[in-house]
């Protein structure tokens, strides 16, 4: 410590017998004291515990350094605060470097701090523990904040020093495992400005948008090599820890060696023991992925083949259990063919009979006979000279003309209606044959000048015949036959049983009626004597 001498020592000397002692003003004594203190303590280092720390709106910081016996007021000007590598906190033991100055307005003295550092590793550990607990209480280290890393990031952002083995190890390991595009944000990783620079880099990566000139990374790696606690201290700073916790991109922290742990590791989504390990955690091994895909492809093909084979076997089993469609429909097809043939024969017979009747009546309605009869009647009427008779003849002739006209219209209507009915039946039952026969009938009718009364009667008869044929066709339907009391016999496999011999070979038979089915068991009837004179079966009447 520098020695000093007080020029105003005569102030302390006893006054002599005379009264010529000089009187100093307060300002003079305060100024003399200020010069003495500032000259004697212009550069000193003071160790103590911080208390009463506050930061004014101007940026200046005010605090006090204390020990067990004394308290020293101190101040840190705004320009010095930005150069301090940590945030001062109450209870922190520090070593302050600066100068003493006095404040004459209140007869106080204070230490103007120009440099501030933590006093020893123990104090650093205590500060680290307090900071860790504070940030943990805020939830920055909660497990639910951790995000899963992307499986195969296309772009990886690295925040580290551009020079050194760290970035080389990361790039080399990524190239070996799975080549990936890497963007390096160069920052200092040690010193007073390291924490702020690294935090700015993390926030800069998070601020990138899709489509920017610099592509947005899918994953961030904050990396630094090993070192002492003081060397790694920037990664314990609150500004950096908060930047990592608030990052919108998943972050891997790879600071120091495996035994080194920083607050950045707690805030990151994943901690890697070394920068090389961070590269291994960031990307998978490409060769392992290829082998895995090949294995999955092989397993998928085998599974598809097994499933196809199993489905084919099941389909074949179902096909064997299903009855044959042709065998199911054979009885109905045969019955339909029989009924169709019978209906065709019946229609042919009816048409032949109708043709004979038509020829018979057509012979009686010859135009020559009609003309001769009309001539005779006209001659007879002409012979009558009575005016009244002539008027009657004229009136009757008019009535006859009206009736004739109406009969012609009715004849045409009935003929059209019959034509439609015949066309409908022709479409159902051999259209070509019916059309030929109908054409013959039409030509024959057109060749004859028929009486309207006879034509109308014939048309009525034909209409009845057609209606009767239609009813016969309906009665020939299989469902109509069942409704009359008949039943269709089938075995357990839905096969038709058509004789008694086959029925005896089955244990159960299915009797199908028009309104349902009944399962029965055939039994052998007891032997009985034949009737001497069995009744003859009644003659089957024709529906036609």
From Swiss-Prot:
Keyword Hydrolase annotated: yes
One GO cellular component, as annotated: cytoplasm
Catalytic activity annotation: Exonucleolytic cleavage in either 5'- to 3'- or 3'- to 5'-direction to yield nucleoside 5'-phosphates
Entry's transmembrane regions: none
Keyword Nuclease appears in the UniProt entry: yes
Role noted for this protein: Bidirectionally degrades single-stranded DNA into large acid-insoluble oligonucleotides, which are then degraded further into small acid-soluble oligonucleotides.
HAMAP family noted in UniProt: Exonuc_7_L (MF_00378)
Protein name: Exodeoxyribonuclease 7 large subunit
Organism from which the protein derives: Zymomonas mobilis subsp. mobilis (strain ATCC 31821 / ZM4 / CP4)
Designated gene of the protein: xseA
């Amino acid at each position: 410590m520098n020695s000093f001498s007080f020029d105003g020592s005569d102030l302390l000397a006893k006054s002599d017998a005379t009264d010529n002692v000089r009187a100093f003003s307060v300002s003079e004594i305060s100024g003399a004291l200020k010069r003495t203190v500032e000259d004697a303590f212009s550069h000193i280092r003071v160790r103590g515990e911080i208390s009463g720390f506050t930061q004014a709106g101007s940026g200046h910081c005010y605090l006090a350094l204390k020990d067990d016996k004394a308290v020293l007021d101190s101040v840190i000007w705004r320009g010095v605060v930005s150069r301090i590598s940590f945030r001062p906190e109450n209870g922190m033991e520090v070593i302050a470097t600066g100068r003493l100055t006095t404040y004459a307005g209140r007869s106080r003295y204070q230490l103007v701090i120009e440099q501030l550092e933590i006093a020893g590793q123990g104090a650093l550990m205590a500060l680290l523990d307090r900071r860790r607990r504070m940030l943990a209480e805020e939830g920055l280290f909660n497990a639910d904040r951790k995000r899963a890393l992307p499986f195969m990031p296309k772009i990886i952002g690295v925040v580290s020093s551009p020079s050194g083995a760290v970035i080389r190890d990361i790039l080399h390991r990524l190239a070996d495992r799975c080549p990936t595009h890497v963007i390096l944000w160069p920052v200092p990783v040690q010193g007073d400005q390291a924490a702020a620079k690294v935090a700015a880099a993390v926030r800069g990566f998070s601020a990138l948008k899709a489509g920017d000139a610099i592509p947005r990374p899918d994953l961030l790696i904050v990396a630094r090599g090993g070192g002492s606690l003081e060397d790694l201290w920037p990664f314990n700073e609150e500004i950096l820890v908060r930047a990592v916790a608030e990052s919108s991109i998943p972050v891997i922290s790879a600071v120091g060696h495996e035994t080194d742990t920083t607050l950045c590791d707690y805030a990151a989504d994943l901690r890697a023991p070394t920068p090389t390990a961070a590269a291994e955690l960031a990307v998978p091994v490409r060769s392992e992925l290829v082998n895995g895909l090949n294995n999955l492809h092989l397993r998928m093909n085998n599974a598809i083949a097994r499933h196809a084979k199993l489905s084919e076997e099941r389909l074949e089993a179902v096909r064997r259990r299903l009855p044959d469609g042709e065998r199911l429909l054979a009885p109905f097809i045969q019955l339909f063919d029989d009924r169709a043939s019978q209906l065709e024969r019946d229609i042919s017979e009816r048409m032949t009979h109708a043709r004979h009747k038509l020829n018979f009546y057509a012979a009686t309605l010859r135009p020559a006979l009609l003309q001769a009869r009309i001539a005779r009647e006209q001659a007879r009427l002409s012979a009558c000279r009575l005016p009244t008779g002539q008027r009657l003849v004229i009136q009757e002739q008019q009535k006859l003309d009206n009736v004739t006209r109406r009969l012609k219209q009715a004849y045409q209507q009935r003929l059209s209606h019959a034509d439609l009915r015949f066309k409908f039946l022709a479409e159902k039952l051999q259209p070509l044959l019916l059309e030929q026969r109908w054409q013959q009938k039409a030509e024959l009718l057109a060749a004859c000048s028929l009486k309207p009364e006879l034509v109308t009667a014939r048309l009525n008869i034909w209409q009845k015949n057609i209606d009767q044929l239609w009813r016969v066709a309906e009665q020939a339907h299989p469902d109509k036959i069942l409704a009359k009391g008949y039943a269709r016999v089938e075995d357990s496999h839905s096969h038709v049983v058509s004789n008694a011999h086959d029925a005896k070979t089955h244990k159960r038979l299915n009797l199908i009626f028009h309104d349902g089915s009944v399962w029965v068991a055939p039994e052998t009837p007891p032997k009985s004597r034949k009737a001497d004179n069995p009744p003859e079966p009644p003659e089957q009447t024709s529906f036609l």
